[in-house]
Amino acid sequence: MPSRVLITSALPYANGPLHFGHIAGAYLPADVYARFRRLLGDDVLYICGSDEYGIAITLNAERVGLGYQEYVSMYHKVHKDTFDKLGISLDFFSRTTNPFHKAIVEDFYLELKSKGLVENQISFQLYSEDEKRFLADRYVEGTCPKCGFDGARGDECQKCGADYEATDLINPRSKLSGSQLVLKETEHAYFHLERMVEPLLAFIEKAYLPEHIRKFVVDYIKNLRPRAITRDLSWGIPVPDFPNKVFYVWFDAPIGYISATMDWAASVNTPDLWKDFWLEESTEYVQFIGKDNIPFHAAIFPAMELGQSIPYKKMNALISSEFYLLEGAQFSKSEGNFVDMDAFLDTYSLDKLRYVLAATAPETSDSEFTFLDFKTRCNSELVGKFGNFINRVLAFAEKNGFRELTCPEALEDKDRQFLDDCQRIVQEAQAYYSKYSLRKACSAIMELAALGNVYFNDQAPWKLLKEGFAHRVEAILFCACYCQKLLALIAYPILPGTAWEIWNMLAPKSLDLENQDKDRVKNLWNTEFIDFSDEVFSLTTPQLLFTIVD
């Protein structure tokens, strides 16, 4: 019976364009996994949406002279266009200004408050008289209270590494205007996360976390403290019965996964369908996020869910990436260290980019994108191994008039060993995808392509054809094409366009392309498709898959 799988990627903040680091961290891995689970025949729902509230949005919208809604709508469209260009196969891309979001955020808050998990508290916060607003930590700097470094950030000193409250800074000032800040009394609602430590630890023990983050998550949960979940802003979801307050963006944003699913259900005219994914314990829920979002997804959002009477689905697996750099430095448009994604895709094919991002994904440690590595991988792996294997086999078949290939009645031992090895690599690739490893999946793809090349070289059908062994040549071509069919299968999650082209050129009897959606190929990774005994290939004119990168 197919499994029901809910997949979410961290909501991109509607405050700027996405770069390769974002894509390699939270979006390509989720897309690859969604495509893989669809191939297995599972009922997959891949959801995402724009995160549209927060002080950074208000400040930047004001700076460029746009209204808040106009500003976030602009970047919502930018993000949607980016995902479309990159082949991110989202089933729905919503936003936190969707018509369902406000009500469910209020419900979460009121439930937590009714259970005594949210209480109001008066505190002193840094306020800018010039800008007439309270400033979040990221917009504050001053002198470190520990080492005396002037220019320390609002929450951490980048010189000595000390962390502190922004109110502990000496001579705090606004990073926006440079004006001195004053302490001003304000009241906020605080979520008593420290009261959720035990249920959170019990929950995390059962969830799948990559080993390199588990200790961090457990330590973080053990040290939870009350956290303000309201802000003094005009842009945000108003807090019930709390005038002039809105919810902190990291309180409302994760709830966006649920409201986005409600939005999707409404879009397909089945308003209650969201419940199949969020209110059924049998659903498998996998989250994909970046490193800096771990605390909110591993502790804060689960705590919010655990505090509800409604049994919302909690994640079964949290897949977090490390940082992805560009030529050894962080992506930064302001500092000129960025890649124009549109210009890049105008120059290079999409699958080249997807492959290199997958092969260098920051799965367990920081990694980087370099143009030299991009060129090397494209030319050596995609052109030299993968593309060469496909092209040489199909070009040879066309040149010599082999169009219809059926499974030979008698396979030689070396053929059977080759076919067994092909199936072994498919099983390995399935294990790699199941464990969320794009890097290892890329290795399996290249291993299978290399295996096919070696087999074709060793059998040397061009020699056999000259010697009059046409039936033997046909058997070799069948085995090579079978390998290519499986190569397209294991490559599809990462190289969907390329896999589709291969299947079109092979036209295998086992695949009805007319009844498949190119972007959502389903129910192929099974014994029927992998079996070769009844296979027939109706070869078409081969097309070059990859070109050299200069």
UniProtKB/Swiss-Prot annotation:
It is found in: Cytoplasm. Binds 1 zinc ion per subunit. Transmembrane segments: none annotated. Its cofactor is Zn(2+). A motif ('KMSKS' region) lies at residues 330-334. InterPro entries: Anticodon_Met (IPR041872), Met-tRNA_ligase_1 (IPR023458), Met-tRNA_synth (IPR014758), Methionyl/Leucyl_tRNA_Synth (IPR015413), MetRS_core (IPR033911), MetRS_Zn (IPR029038), Rossmann-like_a/b/a_fold (IPR014729), tRNAsynth_Ia_anticodon-bd (IPR009080). One of its GO terms (molecular function) is methionine-tRNA ligase activity. Keywords: Aminoacyl-tRNA synthetase, ATP-binding, Cytoplasm, Ligase, Metal-binding, Nucleotide-binding, Protein biosynthesis, Zinc. PANTHER family: METHIONINE--TRNA LIGASE, METHIONINE--TRNA LIGASE, CYTOPLASMIC. This is Methionine--tRNA ligase. It comes from Chlamydia caviae (strain ATCC VR-813 / DSM 19441 / 03DC25 / GPIC) (Chlamydophila caviae).
